[in-house]
């Protein structure tokens, strides 16, 4: 069996060299603020058009859903958009916010994508931000513990996961929670 190899980095998620970079998005796939705004600035404006086309095909996304588009960037091929915030019609107030269950669902959906993507690849490299910890207001420690539990399992493909903490303090929290992994 193979597993996930964890690398922890501090800095700008979009400067990572990877096959796939995860975008903390929303159910309307709008490149708005936070990580999504960074995608908007880093990738060509064609990214939003591609996201709009994916949403047309999907009709409606739920929190935790994952969709892929071309990245339109030089340092990674695929942008994997995770619906973290719920901006669907009729959703108000706190109902827009993610829960830890949203993160668990998202990780399972990311893994399904990785499994299919890895079929004809030696190794896959994915960069991941702290989903739900910006506008979503989830506690970083809680999300990182979910990551640790999820990524410490064996899987049938070879994948390096780059966990990116934007600030020094984020990096330190990730490092301290992950440091006892082999």
Where are these regions (language model features)?
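Macrodomain-like recognition of ADP-ribose-binding/processing modules
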Residues: 1-182
């Amino acid at each position: 069996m193979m597993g996930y190899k964890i690398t922890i980095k501090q800095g700008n998620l979009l400067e990572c060299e990877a096959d796939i970079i995860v975008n903390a998005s929303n159910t309307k796939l709008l490149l708005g603020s936070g990580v999504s705004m960074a995608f908007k600035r880093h990738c060509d404006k064609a990214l939003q058009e591609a996201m709009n086309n994916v949403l047309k095909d999907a009709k409606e996304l739920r929190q935790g859903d994952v969709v892929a588009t071309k990245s339109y960037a030089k340092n990674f091929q695929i942008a994997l958009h995770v619906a973290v915030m719920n901006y669907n019609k009729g959703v108000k107030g706190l109902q827009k916010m993610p829960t830890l269950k949203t993160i668990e669902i998202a990780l399972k959906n990311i893994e399904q994508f990785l499994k299919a993507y890895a079929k004809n690849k030696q190794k896959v490299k994915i960069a991941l931000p702290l989903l739900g910890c910006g506008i979503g207001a989830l506690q970083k420690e809680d999300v990182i513990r979910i990551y640790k539990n999820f990524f410490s399992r064996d899987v049938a493909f070879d994948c390096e996961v780059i966990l990116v903490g934007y600030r020094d303090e984020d990096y330190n929290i990730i490092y301290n929670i992950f440091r006892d992994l082999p």
